[in-house]
A protein has these predicted regions:
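Extended active-site neighborhood of metal-dependent phosphoesterases/phosphodiesterases
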Residues: 73-76, 99-205, 220-239, 247-301, ...
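Short, solvent-exposed aromatic-acidic interface loops
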Residues: 312-321
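N-terminal secretory signal peptides that target proteins for export/translocation
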Residues: 1-15
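Sec-dependent signal peptide recognition
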Residues: 16-22
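C-terminal motif of bacterial Sec signal peptides marking the signal peptidase cleavage site
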Residues: 26-27
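Active-site flanking residues adjacent to catalytic metal/cofactor-binding acidic residues
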Residues: 58-59, 95-96, 131, 209, ...
Length: 329
């Protein structure tokens, strides 16, 4: 694939911000509707001492697109800058890592030249999750072979790890949504999740997977993810990342039935902008949808501090379309 020009990434948290309260671009260009910082907002994010960084996206590599090459360059640039500053980094993927079917050939021809490029830092810190496209080939066997132990136990794909002071949970949403999955396997993941959360009673927790519980995109929210969301909500989990729909969207904290919950609700980020064909939004927008960006490849960078976090959605030029901060429950 052809290499895009290098994105603007000048250092830890030093990215351009658009000083507008609301942007709505239509007509010829990509449509963007997102709440942005006020005009007097600082031009750089405030660093969180001792924080770890999660950066990634979903719906990534395709041999018919150069979007994955651009997002790979962006992620690698951030990793390089953060590493120079001694920041702990982890790269997440939100499923559909490679198109069209997640075969070994797809990984070799389409993923390796961009996100899997050994000259980049991505594979050193990658923590993937599987999507439905990986399961189109031998029930994701090539995915597990490609990523090895970093993908969790073959056939399961769920695992957890530590990032700074945060607990991070990775789930296989295909086990929750596919009618091909035996009920026993679905329950096994749910039981594992309950045990894992009980064994790691940290104040701050983030979980990620492929199919979103809530979405204003063409696929829409996936009701079969409600049991997982309920477990997370009951345990006081703070953040969820998902993909599947090919746009960016941030939601207000909510319960499993889209009830606004500012005290214990889970905040979902949908980031399906890694390189697969971008898609639009549907009206009316999903309840509690707070920010939406369509028509831009990009990644989510979340800085995980002690009891707090900062988030920023960057497109492949380094421009930040949505940013903010929050505190853990």
């Amino acid at each position: 694939m052809e290499r895009a020009s290098a994105p603007l990434v000048t250092g830890v948290g030093q990215h351009r911000y658009r000083a507008l309260a609301l942007v709505l671009l239509v007509a010829c260009g990509p449509r963007v509707e997102v709440s942005l910082p006020p005009a007097d907002a600082p031009a750089t994010a405030v660093a969180i001492a001792g924080a770890a960084v999660l950066i990634g996206t979903g719906d990534i590599a395709s041999c018919t697109s150069t979007g994955d090459e651009a997002t790979a360059q962006l992620v690698d640039s951030v990793l390089k800058a953060d590493s120079a500053a001694g920041v702990e980094n982890h790269v997440f993927t939100l499923g559909d890592n490679v198109y069209p079917r997640g075969s070994a050939r797809d990984f070799e021809r389409c993923f390796t030249p961009s996100w899997g490029d050994p000259t980049r830092r991505i594979m050193k810190w990658i923590r993937p999750s599987p999507g439905n496209h990986e399961h189109d080939t031998d029930w994701a066997a090539p995915y597990y072979r490609y990523f090895g132990a970093r993908a969790g136990e073959p056939g399961k794909g769920y695992y957890s790890y530590k990032a700074g002071e945060w607990h991070v949970v990775v789930l296989n949403s295909v086990l929750a949504v596919s009618p091909r999955v035996p009920a026993a396997d679905r329950r096994a993941q749910e039981d594992w999740l309950r045990r894992d959360l009980a064994e790691h009673p940290t104040r701050c927790t983030v979980a990620y997977w492929h199919h979103p519980r809530f979405s204003s995109g063409t696929h829409g929210g996936v009701i079969r993810m409600e049991p997982i969301w309920r477990i997370l909500h009951d345990a006081g989990v703070d953040l969820v990342f998902a993909g599947h729909d090919h746009h960016y969207e941030r939601f207000l904290p909510q319960g499993p039935n889209a009830t606004l919950d500012t005290l214990r609700g889970v905040t979902q980020f949908l980031v399906g902008t890694g390189g697969g064909t971008l898609r639009g939004l549907r009206r009316p927008y999903a309840r509690n949808s707070a920010a939406r960006v369509q028509g831009h490849f990009g990644v989510l960078k979340v800085t995980l501090g002690s009891g707090e976090y900062q988030h920023a959605f960057l497109d492949v030029t380094g421009r930040v379309w949505d940013r903010g901060r929050g505190r853990c429950h």
